[in-house]
Amino acid sequence: MAKDFRDITLALAGICQASRLVQQIAYQGNADEKDVEVMVNSIFNINPTSTLDVYSNQISHLKLGFQTIKAIHQAVRREKLTFELMTYQQGLINLERIINKNNDYSSHLSQKISQLERQKNYFEPLSDGLFNALAGVYSDAVSPVGPKIQVNGSIELLKNPIIQAKVRGLLLTGLRSAVLWRQVGGRRFDFLLHQKTILRQTDDFLAQC
């Protein structure tokens, strides 16, 4: 069956957007709330009608993700921030593979997300309480299963418990997109083997943002 690179690129943009937001929070302590909200909402969209529906049916909601795909491709590999983004992206894809291959891991994560979905109305959107809850899911159901994603940033910021919670919460949103990436046919080496196709599709999406 032929790969649908439209859907694959959308899911990859979700992974990259989450990775970039993690980086922004870790270095700056803040990020665009609309970009963050799109990613947080994606976790609770358990039964989407399409790939784009995961991101509220708006291509523009993934603009940062498309820009990040381009940045990763265009930058020199030795550039520190770009290397970090590549590390986060691949780390999320690898973690998802480990979880997907183990029924206990995947069931535990699904249960935690379902439980949080039932409780989400008790939290204000993007509140510290919500991020603490998201971080709790990540720490309980994701961190123990495989190699930890080492996040770089401001040492002082990363000592802050709410910054830590936001980083873990956003990594969880990236894992949601990594699940989607696999479901639509994405594979670990697609960005290398089908780079031109993905970049062309990325340019098409950016033109619509």
From Swiss-Prot:
<protein>
    <recommendedName>
        <fullName>High frequency lysogenization protein HflD homolog</fullName>
    </recommendedName>
</protein>
<keyword id="KW-0963">Cytoplasm</keyword>
<keyword id="KW-1003">Cell membrane</keyword>
<keyword id="KW-0997">Cell inner membrane</keyword>
<dbReference type="InterPro" id="IPR035932">
    <property type="entry name" value="HflD-like_sf"/>
</dbReference>
<dbReference type="InterPro" id="IPR007451">
    <property type="entry name" value="HflD"/>
</dbReference>
<dbReference type="GO" id="GO:0005737">
    <property type="term" value="C:cytoplasm"/>
</dbReference>
<dbReference type="GO" id="GO:0005886">
    <property type="term" value="C:plasma membrane"/>
</dbReference>
<dbReference type="Pfam" id="PF04356">
    <property type="entry name" value="DUF489"/>
</dbReference>
<comment type="similarity">
    <text>Belongs to the HflD family.</text>
</comment>
<keyword id="KW-0472">Membrane</keyword>
